[in-house]
Amino acid sequence: TFDEAIENIDIGGPTMLRAAAKNAQDVVVVIDPADYGRVLDELEATGDISLKTKRYLQYKVFEHTAQYDCMIQQYLRSQLDDAPEFPQNLTVTFEKVQEMRYGENPHQKAAFYRDLGDVAGTLPAAKQLHGKELSYNNINDTNGALELLREFDTTAVIAVKHGNPCGVGVADTVSEAYKLAYEADPVSVFGGIVVTNGTVDAATAEQMSKIFLEIIVAPKFTDEALAILTKKKNLRLLELDTTIRAYPKGERVMRKVAGGLLVQEIDDKLLPEDGDLKVVTKAQPTEKQMEDLMLAWKIVKHAK
């Protein structure tokens, strides 16, 4: 409850840490077990802690307490009925998941961070079952594929290459949907990423294993499917509840620009399945044409 949350806000601990860290020249504050080795090694080697290490530990304390305060204000904001859509001061916090081998290009360093709030249905919640570590471009492209998948409440398979949809299939089964997605562009799908909101079974896995794919994401892989797909050493298999169509509460699109940050609402307007479109020509589309248009409308929104 709200009252329990308020009761659990720690006042003394952060105050003690901040006071000690302020006096870092004379006090060593170690809040992260990962730093124990560094401190012990210095003590063993010199009998003291260097000023360089003290200042590093000082920074770690204020980083930690700042994150703690940010999480409190985010919770309090989530409890407001009249919270401003775009607050005057925007404070966000993320936790590092992993450092990448490189970024978008080999000469760029990069890391992946996760939101500390609700991440259900998003990449940070995925469980990697097989394959190499995800790269910067892998994560970026897979996220784009998952955003397109959210448009569908029926069984669908999305194939993405270099951030762009190259195949989409909608059918009664994942196997049929994959066949349609593959046939949309058999050339571009090679080396691409495939995501689905249905279970990958043996029949689907057999089809998928015939070509080189970077990543496959699904809410579930059968044991038979895993036995087939894990024969490919470098293929990444991610298990994620892709049936979740709603974005986490309060999710916003943030885009860094030099000297600032652009923030906007998620574009989660889904085209109605009943085709709520006004035809302004004398020629009326057939039911099949309208069905195709509805599918194309969803896809083109995610084309770059």
Label each region the model flagged.
Residues 68-70, 78-303:
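ATP-dependent carboxylate/acyl-activation modules
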Residues 1-80, 172-173, 198, 255:
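Active-site loop-to-helix "anion-binding N-cap" substructures in soluble metabolic enzymes
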